[in-house]
């Protein structure tokens, strides 16, 4: 690459030493305006036809956008026709205002009014570029010439609106605001304000776009705060943000801009738009939601939002895209999985409605996702993740030491295969190793106990087993069935074994629920677990002993 300092220069930043926005907090959602059907659409390789537009339009209405920019009706017949359809057949709710975009050119303004005939309180969004660079290299005009473009358009629009009987709302954008000197942007905006003559009951939207993101988000916030302080008739204005994402900080720029005094935000679903995209309204809304702020948009079916986005835009959403990507609610890291597992358990036992789960800033169910994909298993996963999957999907509450033991088994498989293991495969491996044991030598069949004739408190156990398919009867002594059965198997197999830990729980609710037992067995070579599942809790325990014994003799 060329030397940075010889090819590029930093963009100037305003001097605002008494800025107040850093101490502010976002306490309510802004007025949202979707520009998917205009800014988003113009950036597509294949712009939307009517069907794709209508599907996006319906979603935006269902989500609750109060303002929707539906196109640039003077720029193409397709946009003009869609504008007419939305007004005549779109069933637009009374609390939704349609917005259209138009350049400050007389013939385009005239066509725009034709497109809006019959609309309820439509917003006419007129704009012209004001940046120093475009004044110099695109328009070859001074500030006065650029201001006249804006004021001539404002006069024409106000005149045509009055002749049409009123009912219109107005929005002005000094396009490329972030590349415009603040005093120039202020001069042009104030000239437009003087012509429109907004009131507190009929406000003018002054949109201050970061058409190209040129600086850090704090600079944009300084620019917004400075404009909010200095614009004429501030109480009759709605200050709007329209950030792009060229530097990857569109979300932060919008949030800081709201802290700096803006009232409104324009953007697109998941950030579609020219170059690196417009700001992502969904991420903004859900960021607010996770801070306890009503976002003003309904994002409860994020899967539908994703499906419509991909159909209408013919674009794919990245797997790591905030809140919507396939992997954003998934942890592979062992320590993360363990923390999530413990957090979910703590939540189930807590009385508080407040969501507090490590590594999950939002409850996936709030946006229509399930808990199934929270934890997925690969070579980086730990015992907590595996335990969570077996508990969440199959109702197994593994003792901690069994979690550690089984994690080593799964770790070996994932290392060997080099890929993720799905939940079903993990359960199958658990069943094969501990429960069904298809290649096991010993199988439990039945048992009986009766009091020891000479030792009070002890019992004699006789058990029927099969050894490689051959039926055998074995006998042992102990304080109960498990103790006696371990004694019988130890003598029969010639291996000293004893139980050091035992636990059990039901697998379903109700009187006919199956029981699962976990037995940790110590033997001369170490310790390992066995697991048994049976409708009878005692039989489940003895099957767990056999499970452990089979693993001992297989060593």
Swiss-Prot record:
GO terms for molecular function: 2-isopropylmalate synthase activity; acetyl-CoA C-acetyltransferase activity; magnesium ion binding. Gene3D superfamilies: 3.30.160.270, Aldolase class I. Residues 437-555 are annotated as: Regulatory domain. InterPro entries: 2-isopropylmalate_synth_dimer, AIPM/Hcit_synth_CS, Aldolase_TIM, IPM_Synthase, LeuA-like_post-cat, LeuA_allosteric_dom_sf, LeuA_N_DRE-TIM, PYR_CT. Mg(2+) binds at residues 39, 242, 244, 278. One of its GO terms (biological process) is L-leucine biosynthetic process. The keyword Amino-acid biosynthesis applies. Its EC number is 2.3.3.13. It is found in: Cytoplasm. NCBIfam families: leuA_yeast, PRK03739.1. Belongs to the alpha-IPM synthase/homocitrate synthase family. LeuA type 2 subfamily. Homodimer. This is 2-isopropylmalate synthase.
């Amino acid at each position: 690459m060329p030397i940075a300092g010889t090819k590029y220069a930093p963009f100037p930043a305003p001097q605002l030493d008494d800025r107040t926005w850093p101490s502010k907090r976002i306490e309510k959602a802004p007025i949202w305006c979707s520009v998917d059907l205009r800014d988003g659409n113009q950036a597509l390789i294949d712009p939307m036809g009517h069907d794709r537009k209508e599907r996006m339009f319906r979603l935006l209405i269902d989500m609750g956008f109060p303002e929707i920019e539906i196109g640039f009706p003077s720029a193409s017949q397709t946009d003009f026709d869609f504008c007419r359809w939305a007004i005549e057949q779109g069933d637009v709710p009374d609390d939704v205002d349609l917005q259209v975009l138009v350049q400050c050119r007389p013939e385009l303004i005239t066509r725009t009014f034709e497109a809006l005939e019959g609309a309820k309180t439509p917003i006419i969004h007129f704009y012209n570029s004001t940046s120093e660079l475009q004044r110099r290299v695109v328009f070859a005009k001074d500030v006065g010439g650029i201001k006249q473009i804006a004021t001539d358009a404002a006069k024409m629009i106000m005149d045509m609106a009055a002749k049409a009987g009123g009912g219109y709302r107005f929005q002005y954008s000094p396009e490329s605001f972030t590349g415009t000197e603040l005093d120039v942007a202020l001069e042009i905006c104030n000239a437009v304000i003087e012509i429109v003559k907004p009131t507190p009951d009929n406000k003018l939207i002054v949109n201050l776009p970061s058409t190209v993101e040129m600086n850090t988000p704090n600079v944009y916030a300084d620019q917004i705060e400075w404009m909010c302080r200095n614009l004429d008739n501030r109480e009759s204005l709605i200050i709007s943000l329209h950030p792009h994402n060229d530097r990857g900080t569109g979300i932060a720029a919008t949030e800081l801009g709201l802290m700096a005094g803006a009232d409104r935000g324009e953007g697109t679903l998941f950030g579609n738009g020219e170059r690196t995209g417009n700001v992502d309204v969904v991420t903004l809304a859900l960021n607010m939601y996770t801070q306890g702020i009503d976002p003003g948009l309904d994002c409860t079916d994020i899967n539908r939002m994703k499906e419509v986005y991909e159909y209408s835009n013919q674009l794919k959403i990245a797997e790591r895209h905030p809140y919507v990507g396939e992997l954003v609610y998934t942890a592979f890291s062992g320590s993360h999985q363990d923390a999530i597992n413990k957090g979910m358990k703590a939540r189930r036992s807590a009385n508080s409605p407040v969501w507090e789960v490590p590594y999950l800033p939002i409850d996936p169910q709030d946006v229509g996702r399930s808990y199934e994909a929270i934890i997925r298993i690969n070579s980086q996963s730990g015992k907590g993740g595996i335990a969570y999957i077996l508990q969440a999907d199959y109702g197994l509450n593994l003792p901690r030491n069994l979690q550690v033991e089984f994690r080593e088994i799964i770790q070996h498989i994932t290392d060997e295969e080099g890929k993720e293991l799905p939940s079903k495969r993990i359960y199958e491996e658990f069943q094969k190793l501990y429960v069904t044991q298809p290649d096991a030598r010993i199988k439990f069949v039945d048992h009986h106990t009766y009091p020891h004739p000479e030792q009070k408190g002890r019992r004699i156990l006789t058990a029927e087993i099969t050894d490689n398919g051959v039926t055998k009867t074995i006998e042992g002594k102990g304080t109960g069935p498990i103790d006696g059965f371990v004694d019988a198997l130890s003598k029969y197999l010639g291996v000293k074994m004893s139980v050091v830990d035992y636990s059990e729980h039901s697998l379903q609710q109700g009187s006919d629920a199956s029981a699962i037992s976990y037995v940790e067995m110590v033997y001369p070579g170490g310790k390992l677990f066995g697991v048994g599942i049976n409708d009878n809790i005692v039989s489940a325990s003895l099957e767990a002993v056999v499970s452990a014994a089979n693993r001992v003799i297989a060593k």
